[in-house]
Each structure stands twice: as structure tokens, then as C-alpha cells.
Regions:
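Long, low-complexity, intrinsically disordered terminal regions
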Residues: 1-256
Length: 256
């Protein structure tokens, strides 16, 4: 008599997981919360105690045309104090101020550190094509910042809206160019544009930029708290996606 063939193993289509807790304030086992902004406000950053030993104040360099310097400075100053969050969703939280969150002040770097560009792309960098000029200006700016690397922690790079048609084309992407060069030279950068400078909800803007600046300066705002039954050396890879609907067609945008 023939034995029956084994049934094929079928995995479930999906599994629902509980929202994991995040760990803050290293050394305090009770410093955990599922909400990153509440956790930061209540306990402080995960590495706040050690971060202050090698970064007493977080210094920001500016790269961009002269016309944007004052706006970027004002935006940076707004991160230092409390800001009201006008979003009405459950995630939104009032922003308490940079030093309150991270234990270090947020200041502009010394004047000689900043890199000021001309107002027009035709006067920027070197090369026949606009993309070559932008690439040249980015390379010159970051190479100059490399010579004063001990005088700043992160660079804010401002691209005005009037430059946008030339910053991203089929053959060229200024953002990618900047990030690749910054990675090579060990210079963390945060890109700003007019939309971010004009953003009405200052609380939401402050949260996003403050966490980004802290992390890009070498800090760890939070980390995944230990999960029961999972080895400590386990690595996690997050995968998220959004479905954008346009003309009744679904478009998927994944991000890892």
C-alpha cells in the first residue's frame, strides 16, 4: 500500500506583530516607550549620557546661497526652544526644545566655517553644463568643510526652489551627488529647501530636523528594546511601503 504524499507546508499570508517598545536613556531598564517622541521627551536619547562627553554643543555649518543664510539660521534657532505641534493626529507631540531633548545646545558654527554660494547657477562652480557646475560646487564645498571638520558636527545644505529644475534630471541628482560625496569624506549633511523653511507646523518640522541632526551627528535617539525570546545579537531590517493612488491606479513606493 502506497503511503500518502505529505501535505505541502503553507505559511500564513501575514502575521500581526505587536508594536515593539523602544529603549531610551541607556542604563535605565525602565526607560522604554512605544512612541518615539514621547520616549525622547520623557527619558532623553538612548546615548545622551555618553554623547555629551564628546559633543558638548552641536555645531551646524551652512552651505548655500547668501540669500538663504538668514532663513536657515532662523530655522535652526527655532529648534532650540519649544514649538507647538498643530497636527491633530495621535502621533503629534509638542516639541520641547533641542537641549531639553538631547542635553546639548544647537548652535551655528563659526563664521569662517560656512560656505556661501553665488545666487545664480550660472555663477556656481565650473563646467559647461549646469549639472557640472552644481557637481563642482558641491565637491568644492565639502572639500572645504573637510579642512575644518573639527569645527562643526553637521552641515545644512540649502537648495532654493528656483534651482530645482536643474537639481534633478534624468542624468543628474544633486541630492544623491551630495550624499555620495559626504559619505566619502565623512561629512553628514541635511538638505533644506524652501518648502521646509516655509512649513507652517513648526512643531512637526522641529521634531523631524532635530532628530535628524542628532542622529547625523553620531547620536542614537533610541533603539529597539529587547524582545523576549529573541537573541540579543539579532539584526532587524525594516521594510515599509506606501500605496499612492493616482487616476485609480495603485503605485507602490517601498522603502527599507
Amino acid at each position: 500500500m502506497n503511503a500518502e504524499a505529505p501535505s505541502p507546508i503553507q505559511l500564513p499570508a501575514f502575521t500581526l506583530l505587536d508594536e515593539p517598545a523602544l529603549a531610551f536613556a541607556s542604563g535605565d531598564p525602565k526607560a522604554m516607550h512605544r512612541h518615539p517622541l514621547i520616549g525622547l521627551s520623557r527619558f532623553g536619547a538612548f546615548d545622551q549620557a555618553s554623547f555629551r562627553h564628546y559633543v558638548s554643543e552641536l555645531r551646524v555649518a551652512y552651505v548655500g546661497p547668501r540669500s538663504g543664510a538668514a532663513q536657515v539660521r532662523d530655522m535652526r534657532e527655532s529648534l532650540r526652544g519649544p514649538q507647538r505641534n498643530t497636527d491633530r493626529n495621535s502621533y503629534a507631540q509638542a516639541y520641547p526644545g533641542f537641549e531639553t531633548l538631547f542635553g546639548v545646545d544647537l548652535l551655528g558654527a563659526d563664521k569662517q566655517v560656512h560656505v556661501v554660494w553665488p545666487e545664480e547657477l550660472c555663477d556656481l562652480g565650473q563646467g559647461e553644463k549646469v549639472a557640472d557646475r552644481i557637481r563642482s560646487a558641491l565637491h568644492h564645498a565639502l572639500k572645504r568643510l573637510e579642512t575644518v571638520r573639527d569645527q562643526f558636527d553637521v552641515a545644512l545644505v540649502y537648495f532654493p526652489d528656483r534651482w530645482l529644475p536643474h537639481l534633478r534630471t534624468k542624468e543628474f541628482d544633486a541630492h544623491d551627488e551630495l550624499k555620495a560625496l559626504g559619505a566619502q569624506l565623512g561629512i553628514p549633511t541635511q538638505v533644506l529647501n524652501d518648502k521646509s523653511l516655509r512649513f507652517d507646523n513648526r512643531g512637526a518640522r522641529a521634531w523631524r530636523l532635530a532628530v535628524a541632526l542628532y542622529a547625523k551627528s553620531g547620536g542614537t535617539p533610541w533603539k529597539l528594546a529587547p524582545i523576549g525570546g529573541v537573541p540579543d545579537a539579532t539584526a532587524y531590517i525594516g521594510l515599509a511601503y506606501v500605496i499612492r493612488r493616482w487616476l485609480d491606479e495603485a503605485h507602490h513606493a517601498p522603502c527599507s
